Amino acid sequence: MLPQNKDQVLPQTSVLPGRPTWGFSQLVDSSPHNLQPLSPHQGLPPSQPPFSSTQSRRPSSPPPASPSPGFQFGSCDSNSDFAPHPYSPSLPSSPTFFHQNYLSLPRPRASSPSNHWLYPSPPLTPSFSPSQPQNSSLPHSPCQSPSHPEELHSSTLTSPGPSPPSHRLHSNRQTWRWHQYRDTGSGSPGVVERCVPSEKDPAQFRDPGALAQALVVQLGHRRIAHDLRLLLLQHLWLGRTGQAPVVEYPICLVCLRPRSPSCPLPRYRTGPRLLAFPQLLPCVQGQESGPLRIGIGFGLRLPQGQARALHLLPEKRPKEAGPQGKATQACGHQLPASQPPAAQARADPVPGTPSQTRSFRSAGLQSPNSPRCFSGPPPRAPKQVTTSLKPRPCPGPKRPVSLELILQKSSV
């Protein structure tokens, strides 16, 4: 039983002798207004050869001679030798190597000069309605076969640029990375956070440990552990086993966060820093011997004036050590000349503030004895003089102290 439009179907199926017939592919590729609906009981025309199971797949065979029912074949490169003219005599008359129900997805564009796709279409069934064009199943296909078989002689399958499917996949990947970067970041890229003053004044902590703990919470334990691990691996790689790995974070005492470009300039030349370093801790607290674990210690590096302004230094120690420091300085001036400087250093009671002890030690290193013992210039090797243990008499006021004599005595 033939369709009603015999004058339209018969010229399409009549081809040159020795060439394969097109069959239903002409009906699929033709425009919808030229097609008539098929009845459910209508069978295949006698000119259409049935598909056999032995001719279903031949991956190593040459390209198909004629497109099978439900398939569209196209190429995206005009320089390709794999896409000859459909009516070219160089095409062999071999059967198709893909089954009708076999689905092959379009592959992304590679670096080869010619790329080909085999776009599957749903197989022809009795319930197929020709009111919708067959090419609508592939809206993004870059190369589609012409709608009429007469246009095959004049149509060229060329595409100067890359295929749209590969561009679409690449753009989706970039978009996903950009969204991932925006989600992982603290804010939108290129925007600097403002320095908002903290609700709690740093002077209210009155304890360096509490202030350091508040800064650690703002930084995050995971970030500090990651940075410390990288620094430790760097020291091991470079062979710096003698140096302890210490990570320093410049902080802002206005917002109690890591320093940013929007934070005000520090008052002192060396700004406040948070230190993080590894330390060995016992697994069980209070147990001296046993397995150890690696912990993270924290510290603050502040100028002395800023630490006093924030009341982070105890105030009782300078008051108690003030008169004692003055008394020790007075006793040091009244010591006899025969007393060595080592004994003078031992006679020093409990030291006071760091500034007082620093000034006192520097004075003791510069002059091993009291200034009343000799009138000559002070010795040039104070370290060797302070390490000598033998008492030596104070030289006379008219006899200058020679450096050679001091070195000989210290070497003995």
Curated annotation (Swiss-Prot):
Show the InterPro entries listed in the entry: DUF4679
Q: Where is the composition biased (Low complexity)?
A: 50-59, 126-142, 334-350
Polar residues compositional bias: what residue ranges? 1-15, 23-39, 353-372
Q: What are the boundaries of the region Disordered? A: 1-88, 123-174, 317-412
Superkingdom of origin organism: Eukaryota
Task: Name a Pfam family for this protein.
Answer: DUF4679
* Protein name (database record): Proline-rich protein 30
> What is the taxonomic lineage of the source species?
Eukaryota, Metazoa, Chordata, Craniata, Vertebrata
